Amino acid sequence: MTKFDYIIVGGGSAGCVLANRLTEDKATNVCLIETGPKDKNPLIHIPAMYAFLRGANLIYEYDTVPQKNFSDVTLAEGPAKISDTFGRTYSIPQSYEEKRKGYQPRGKVLGGSSSVNGMLYVRGHKWDYDHWAELGNEGWSFKEVLPYFKKSENNEVFSDDLHGQGGPLNVAAQRHDNPFTRFFVEAGSKVHKLNNDFNGDDQEGVGIYQVTQKNGLRCSSAVAYLNPIKDRENLTIFTDTTVEKIEFEKLRAKSVKCISTVSYTHLRAHETSL
C-alpha cells in the first residue's frame, strides 16, 4: 500500500487548486487522482474548438432530470410579437415542454469542467453569498469571499478594489470582435442597461463576457494551478485512474482503492482523502 499525507480524488477545477496549495509545504506528500486523461488534446486549448469537444471522450454527457408531477404535455402560451429591423411586426406562437431536459456536460480530464467549458468568467451574485451567510454559514458573505476571488485572478481588463492581479487564473477580454455580438448587445440595451463588467459593483445588465484565457488559449484550472507545479517532488499525479472505493475510519476518509488501464492500486492518506 502506497501512503501519502493527502489524497485528492478528482483532478478537476477544485482538485488542481488543492494540489497546488497543499504541496506548497514541501514536507507534505500529495496524490492527485483523475479518472480522465492529461489535458493534451488541442481541442481543449484552442478556445473556438470547445464546441467540438462533445465527441472527444473528455466529457460526461449528463442531462437534467425533469421535475416530478409536471405535465407531460406541451403547454402553449399566448403569441409573442416580434419586430424586425425594417419595423415590421410579426405574431408567432410560443410553447414549452414541462418535461424538458437540460444538457449538463462535465469534464473528464485534468482540469475537469474548466478544461471543456465556454471559458466565461462570471462570479456568483453577491446576494447569494450574503444569503448563505444569513443562513448561518460563517465566512461565506460576499465581503468575506471576495479576497479569494481577487487572490485567484490576474485580470487584464480591470484593476480596482473588486479585481485582482498576479493570481494564477488569467482573466482577459475576448480577442475576437464579432460584429454580431455587438449588434446583440446593442439590441439588449434597448430593454436593459449596459454593463461592461459582470464581476463589478453592479452584476446585472447586458454586455460582453470576460474569459479565462491567456495569450489566446484556454486558462483552465489545470493550466493555471497544476502545470506550473506538476514537477514538485511531493506531488504524484495519476491520470486515467478511477477510484472504485473510498475507505473510512469513523467519519474520516483514509484510503482509496483505484484501478487504471494497467494496474489496481491501494492508496492510504496519513491525514485525509479529499
In which residue ranges do the predicted regions lie?
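N-terminal redox-cofactor-binding region of secreted/periplasmic oxidoreductases
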Residues: M1-R268
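A short, hydrophobic C-terminal helix/tail in secreted or cell-surface proteins
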Residues: A269-L274
